[in-house]
């Protein structure tokens, strides 16, 4: 099954995942659009279809382990591991005192080939933090898989990177944000503080 860009966007819109307002994103930048992938992840069949489509781009890369940052990367890592094979493990990183860490007795074995996955990227900072953890454990990052790249393709991770959908949604530094200048309160919907 090949999923078309228009079909993906339509499903995200139908699920209420494309939200309008004034948002302070996890990366600290502001935007008038927020993509809440949890609204799509509550539909396992569609999530499986999305991850199957993305997973096709990594078949043959001999992946041992998939790692995603909490919260959005947890479900995605699990589904991607199921798509890529019965022996592919799935784990996640999470924040502890504001720092991305590997907990819950999860291990990355030396030399393991790792695919890092994320639901939405804007600046790529969470993915880079996960990549740093993998490298610090002597794992080898062989790729990055992203459902939605909202940077318009500007983020470069230095490894094979596949995105299911690339959109260019305007972001602003807080001091340059037109919504802040109008006095519109910003909502912080992300999971960085969790």
Annotate each language-model stretch with its function.
Residues 1-194:
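PRPP-associated nucleotide enzymes
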């Amino acid at each position: 099954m090949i999923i078309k860009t228009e079909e993906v966007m339509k499903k995200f819109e139908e699920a209420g995942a494309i939200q309008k307002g004034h948002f302070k994103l996890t990366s600290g930048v502001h935007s008038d659009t927020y993509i809440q992938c949890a609204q799509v992840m509550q539909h396992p069949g569609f999530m499986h279809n999305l991850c199957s489509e993305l997973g096709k781009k990594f078949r043959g890369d001999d992946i041992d382990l998939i790692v995603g940052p909490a919260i959005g990367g947890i479900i995605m890592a699990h589904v991607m591991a199921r798509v890529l094979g019965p022996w592919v493990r799935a784990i996640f990183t999470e924040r502890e005192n504001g720092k991305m860490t590997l907990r819950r007795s999860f291990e990355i074995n030396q030399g393991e080939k790792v695919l890092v996955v994320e639901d939405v990227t804007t600046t790529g900072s969470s993915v880079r933090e996960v990549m740093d953890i993998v490298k610090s454990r002597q794992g080898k990052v062989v790729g990055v898989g992203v459902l939605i790249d909202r940077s318009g393709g500007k983020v470069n991770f230095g490894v094979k990177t596949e995105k299911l959908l690339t959109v260019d949604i305007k972001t602003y530094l807080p001091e340059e944000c037109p919504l802040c200048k109008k006095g519109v309160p910003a909502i912080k919907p992300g999971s960085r503080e969790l």
